[in-house]
């Protein structure tokens, strides 16, 4: 079995987690108490969904997940929410005082006390797996817990489970919307360890997802629930091939192989189509070609950066529902002929496609329409560097005055860590620049010979 363990860290990680597990349960027909009437093989069984759920002898399905936060309020919502019976109480770990938006508290002082407990619980989940494939880690890098404890856990997972893949779903600060003043510090410090300790990171950013909700779903004032439900569709599409039997299945390690040309260049953009409200879907025929095109629209990207400003290195298209390979090939062929979508010249094919016959499921009473087919795209584009350069600029403005730095130093960090992390990110921006311009230099030489 190829199990995946999900680790949800901090408020963002947990709330995205809630949306994901709600959706998984609906997709597999698992009730909020963990019972699954449709499952005939009680206690174990080699069903595809066992990658994400473990089964008890009593036929209860328990998510292979842990939720961690340094303060109790968000986890208490899980403990009292609709799905309270789904999780084992030991899977929900909360501390007493929060990280106060401070990376150093999450990473050094307070995080340090809780991290062993987390690893212990993860070890229990891992022992329960026959062939652990890897970890899905959900966090945000703007806050204190997601960035600090998130980095700490990733570092420790690398030590304990060196060869296992780690996929990160990471909420990055948005250009305009900010939830805390020290976001740039936390993000830079945290990206420093994401660079080293995740194999693939999918960047999400609230502002981009707000815009998608407003534009495509006509939600005047989107809430985090609206945002998270959209994100959960993306994550569900990515993991569908692990949870259902499909025609063209895609493994977690396959993402890595197909999307990451160089170890450091592993920050991905994601998009999902069709994002459409029930009123509209009734009147539209959404063909494979149409949803494929809209997945490539800059406005569909779930992070604020424009793929037209960069080049694609690789792309993963995960289709689900009523889709046949012939249509996919045609749609991809059309995309390749478009001049607006540029690939780097050293990666001619650039597409990895997966198809899953399970139609997309929607949360009842949610915003998305029930559709026959959907596509989720994860792409590696040099334009992601825009996200980093934005954060770096803000970091530099504050750090030049050493503003707020004493809060971090007071928790046992050294100033050197700031500059080290910042240099690492500067190097990353440079890496992206070079990858995009890889063989452009070759062209200049040819022109020289023409004279």
UniProtKB/Swiss-Prot annotation:
The lineage of its organism: Eukaryota, Viridiplantae, Streptophyta, Embryophyta, Tracheophyta. Belongs to the tubulin family. Its cofactor is Mg(2+). The modification N6-acetyllysine is found at residue 40. PANTHER family: TUBULIN. It is found in: Cytoplasm, Cytoskeleton. Keywords: Acetylation, Cytoplasm, Cytoskeleton, GTP-binding, Hydrolase, Magnesium, Metal-binding, Microtubule, Nucleotide-binding. This is Tubulin alpha chain. It is an enzyme of class 3 (hydrolase). GTP binds at residues 11, 71, 144-145, 179, 206, 228. Pfam families: Tubulin (PF00091), Tubulin_C (PF03953). The record marks 451 as: Involved in polymerization. One of its GO terms (biological process) is microtubule-based process. Dimer of alpha and beta chains. A typical microtubule is a hollow water-filled tube with an outer diameter of 25 nm and an inner diameter of 15 nM. Alpha-beta heterodimers associate head-to-tail to form protofilaments running lengthwise along the microtubule wall with the beta-tubulin subunit facing the microtubule plus end conferring a structural polarity. Microtubules usually have 13 protofilaments but different protofilament numbers can be found in some organisms and specialized cells.
């Amino acid at each position: 079995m190829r199990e995946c363990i999900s680790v949800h860290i901090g408020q963002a990680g947990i709330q995205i987690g809630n949306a994901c597990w709600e959706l998984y349960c609906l997709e597999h027909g698992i009730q909020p108490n963990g019972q699954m009437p449709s499952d005939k093989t009680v206690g174990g069984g080699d069903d595809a969904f066992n990658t994400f759920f473990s089964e008890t002898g009593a036929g209860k399905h328990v998510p292979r997940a842990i939720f961690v936060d340094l303060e109790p309020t968000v986890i208490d919502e899980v403990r009292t929410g609709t799905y309270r019976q789904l999780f084992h109480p030991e899977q929900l770990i909360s501390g007493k005082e929060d990280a106060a938006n401070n990376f150093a508290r999450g990473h050094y002082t307070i995080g340090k006390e809780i991290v062993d407990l987390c690893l212990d619980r993860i070890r229990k989940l891992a022992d329960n797996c026959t062939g652990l494939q890897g970890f899905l880690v959900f966090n945000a890098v703007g806050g204190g817990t997601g960035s600090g404890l998130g980095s700490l856990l990733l570092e420790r997972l690398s030590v304990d489970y060196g060869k296992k893949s780690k996929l990160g779903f990471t909420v990055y600060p948005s250009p305009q919307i900010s939830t805390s003043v020290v976001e740039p510090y936390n993000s830079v410090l945290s990206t420093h360890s994401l660079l080293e300790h995740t194999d693939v990171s999918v960047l999400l950013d609230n502002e981009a997802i707000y815009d998608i909700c407003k534009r495509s779903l006509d939600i005047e004032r989107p809430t985090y629930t609206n945002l998270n439900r959209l994100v959960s569709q993306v994550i569900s599409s990515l993991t569908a091939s692990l949870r259902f039997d499909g025609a063209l299945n895609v493994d977690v390690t396959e993402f890595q192989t197909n999307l990451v040309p160089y170890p450091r260049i592993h920050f991905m953009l994601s998009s999902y189509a069709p994002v459409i409200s029930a009123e509209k879907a009734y009147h539209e025929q959404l063909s494979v070609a149409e949803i494929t095109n809209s997945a490539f629209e800059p406005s569909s990207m779930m992070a604020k950066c424009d793929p037209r400003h960069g080049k694609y290195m690789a792309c993963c298209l995960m289709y689900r529902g009523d889709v046949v390979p012939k249509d996919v090939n045609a749609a991809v062929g059309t995309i390749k002929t478009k001049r607006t979508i540029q690939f780097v010249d050293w990666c001619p094919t650039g597409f990895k496609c997966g198809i899953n016959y399970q139609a997309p499921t929607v949360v009842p009473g949610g915003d998305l329409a029930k559709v026959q087919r959907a596509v989720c795209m994860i792409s590696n584009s040099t334009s992601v560097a825009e996200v980093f350069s934005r954060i770096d600029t803000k970091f530099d403005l504050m750090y030049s005055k050493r503003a707020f730095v004493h809060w971090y130093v007071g928790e046992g960090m050294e100033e050197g860590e700031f500059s080290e992390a910042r240099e690492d990110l500067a190097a990353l921006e440079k890496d992206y620049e070079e990858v995009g311009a890889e063989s452009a230099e070759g062209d200049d030489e040819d022109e020289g010979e023409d004279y």
